[in-house]
Curated annotation (Swiss-Prot):
GO terms for cellular component: endoplasmic reticulum membrane; ER to Golgi transport vesicle membrane; Golgi membrane; SNARE complex. Residues 1-194 are cytoplasmic. The gene is sec22. It comes from Schizosaccharomyces pombe (strain 972 / ATCC 24843). Coiled coil: none annotated. This is Protein transport protein sec22.
């Protein structure tokens, strides 16, 4: 499952973060500290996508337009879904706030209202139906097994770098448009499966009421 999410500029300014319940805050206390250390290591030359393993959890991050989207997931959570989730957040955040998020003088967490979208997306990606869509992701999205993977000890305590590898970066840029389109379609299908039947029933009820009392 996706447990927690942060949105941070590459200069270190936090823009938004998911509001997590007390249990999640307690269980992820040390991992959130590690997340802050990871974010401090990032720069414009860092790998644009990476996964960093730490015990029972994995950090996945995506850098887009000078902004880093980072989520903490259970180690068993499919990497493809994690990056699809981050792509969805990146697209929505940039469409909603754009270059406003890059302006100087912003206060920390200036876009706290983005938590509403993060929570909705997290619920969708944490449903069993999301895992059912993995077959589509397998054929339509970039092979994320090639995404840089690090161990938290190697990164924070042994001096490993998150600087990008040229061949991997070019491959990721080449597939970015296809990845984003496929991820959005999978998310829309998951939303339809979750809310479509209720919407149809509500529409039929309204038609019946109109026909019964106003026709």
């Amino acid at each position: 499952m996706v447990k927690s999410t942060t949105v941070t500029r590459l200069d270190g300014l936090p823009l938004a973060a998911s509001v997590d319940d007390e249990s999640t805050e307690r269980n992820l206390e040390s991992h959130k500290k590690q997340a802050k250390l990871i974010l401090k290591r990032l720069s414009p030359t860092s790998e644009k996508r990476a996964s960093i393993e730490s015990g029972d959890y994995t950090f996945h991050y995506l850098i887009d337009n000078g902004i880093c989207y980072l989520c903490i997931c259970e180690q068993s959570y499919p990497r493809k879904l994690a990056f699809s989730y981050l792509e969805e957040l990146a697209g929505e955040f940039w469409n909603s706030f754009g270059e406003e998020a890059l302006q100087p003088g912003l206060r920390p967490y200036a876009f706290v209202q983005f938590d509403t979208f993060m929570q909705k997306s997290k619920r969708v990606y944490n449903t069993p139906r999301a895992n059912d869509n993995l077959d589509k992701l397998n054929t339509e999205l970039k092979d994320v097994t090639r995404v840089m993977t690090k161990n938290i000890e190697d990164l924070l305590y042994r001096g490993d770098s998150l600087e990008k590898m040229a061949d991997l970066s070019s491959d990721l840029r080449y597939s970015s448009a296809k990845y984003k389109k496929a991820a959005r379609r999978v998310n829309l299908e998951a939303l339809w499966r979750q809310y479509g039947p209720v919407s149809i029933i509500a529409l039929l009820f309204l038609i019946f009421v109109y026909w019964r009392f106003f026709a």
